Amino acid sequence: MVLFIISAVLTSYCVLLLLFALFQVALGEPLDLHWLHKILLFFGVVFITFGVVGIGLIWKQEWPIVPLSLQATAPFLQFGAVGALTLLSPFIFRGSKFLIAVAFIAVSAAIFLCPLYIQSPCLIEVHELPEKPKLIGHRGAPMLAPENTMMSFEKSIACGVTAFETDIQLSKDRIPFLMHDNNFPGFLRRTTDIKDKFPEKANSRDSANFTWEELQSLNAGDWFVKVRTDPFHSVSYLSEDDIEAARNQTIPSLLQLLNLAKEHNISVIFDIYSPEKENETDDIVKTILHSGIDRSRVLWLPPTKREHVKKIAPGFTHFYKDSEEKEGNYLNVKYSELNMADIRKHRSSNVTVNIWGVNERWLFSLLWCSGASSVTTNSCHILKDMDRPDWVLVSNKYSCMYISLCFTFFISPSIRTLKTFLLPFINNFLTKLQT
């Protein structure tokens, strides 16, 4: 956090310094940078550069978000870049060095050619806009209530979700329950009070070490409302009643969730941890069948024993994680693993495509324009209120706007040139007429 604050301060300082420099150039004042500013500017550039490189190395898995974000912002970034070029051009060509002028022309050419490479799914006619993707609550509504608790799933119902997404493990006495963290020492410590209730088991890594009675006795909500662990910084927006309800949540069983889903005609999609255990899949299937939920509302995702599940529980809707391995018409992939063109291709082939990890409006907008069937999200309370994507721009209108900007860029220097060379001539001509 400290590094981010330092980076923000240095970035603001560099931007302000650049603005002051532009003002001085515009006023015709000489640029005379104090030695202290030179040192700070050099330090800021080096610090920010190393920071960006470091973040890129640490979060390599997030690099796919860059081209996606450009699809959402490229048309507007290009407009802004053209505006900046228009403002900077008189300063660049006013006695600039040859190399600087050449570099400026090269950058200008790249910016003006950008529209040839901009491919955004939201550059479409309004009447071509696909149906809004359905919402699947990732562990319920984890921004509004503790994840994987009954309160969380009840909150997601208010968002209009069509499915609950959850994670299933088995207790020592073979009761399926809901919990994401798994297979590492202290897997219950993040979301329960295991350290207080069973300190001798606090570092256990296996759900089979706990009976269902022990799991039910754990508090699964108090961690959520504490300032130190508030995962989405959203607790301050909750009512006192919601905070109190969250504080008293417990670990639910799979059967409880299935009964809630059956009551509200909502589907259920889930992962199983750890699916390699003997008979674990069978125990979960038995619980599902015992609940009486409509089998078509069970969106089966785990690849383990899939063929066996198809035999003992026909009627489940099977989702696949890989477009190359899928055998049916249902696909469940992360937002970074399928490009927008592929989504459209699958949808045109009547394949249902669910995209998971979608928590931001801009990403949801892109997927909406691309035709995604549904998204799995933490922020269903935000996405439910969207009546249309953040922006939709008809290609013809974008072309007109682009041509207008180009005209403005090229005509403004011409006007300045005419004023420079013609005004003295006109004034001289008028003076002669008067004499």
Region locations from a protein language model:
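Phosphate-group recognition and catalysis centered on beta-loop-alpha active-site segments
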Residues: 1-435
